[in-house]
Regions:
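N-terminal glycine-rich phosphate-binding loop for ADP-containing cofactors
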Residues: 1-181
Length: 181
């Protein structure tokens, strides 16, 4: 969350999950693809409504890093607090898939132009205005950087495989904002 807050989002995904409630879609005793959430919910750490979730919360609902959550993360992942990736890697891992998905939306002709995607993110999802939206941000970091991250993520999980348009932009030195269906 700290990395995405520093990027400019008001909330990171764990803060947002706590706000919505970790138990949405969770069933006691069921095993899901999210063992950290399962463990938190089993301990009745269901987010802000219970005063604890990914974070502990004070009386003003301010998030406080949780030792309980840190232990669960360490137990599930084998990574101790402080052993996590750096801010730049976290941002790339969270943001670059949005850029790749934006290109897929354009490939599927679900949007007319890249700037339409940026407008939705800026006005609908709280994208940081100084970053211009995911497609313009893609131009700020460059298609080659986005492609390298997506190839790495795609090697671990096919859903993150780089789309054809991303490969073309990286090869040709093209710009995300110029892509049209």
């Amino acid at each position: 969350d700290a990395a995405l807050n520093a990027f400019g989002f008001r909330m990171g995904p764990y803060q947002m999950s706590d706000l919505a409630g970790l138990d949405i879609g969770w069933k006691k005793g069921a095993t899901t693809a999210n063992p950290i959430r399962d463990a938190l919910c089993e301990l009745d750490r269901r987010g802000q409504k219970t005063g604890a979730g990914n974070y502990d919360y004070d009386e003003n609902r301010r998030p406080i890093p949780s030792d309980v959550t840190a232990k669960i993360i360490a137990d599930v992942t084998g990574v101790e607090a402080g052993g996590a990736p750096g801010q730049d890697e976290i941002i790339a891992t969270c943001i670059y898939p949005m850029i790749n998905e934006g290109l897929k939306i354009l490939e599927e002709k679900m949007a007319q132009r890249a700037s339409d995607i940026d407008i939705v993110w800026l006005n609908g999802y709280g994208w940081p205005a100084d970053k211009g939206g995911p497609m313009l941000y893609g131009d700020m970091v460059g298609a080659e950087a986005v492609l390298a991250t997506m190839e790495k993520l795609g090697a671990e999980d096919d859903q993150f495989a780089p789309c054809a348009t991303l490969k073309r932009l990286a090869a040709d030195g093209g710009h995300f904002i110029d892509v049209q269906p």
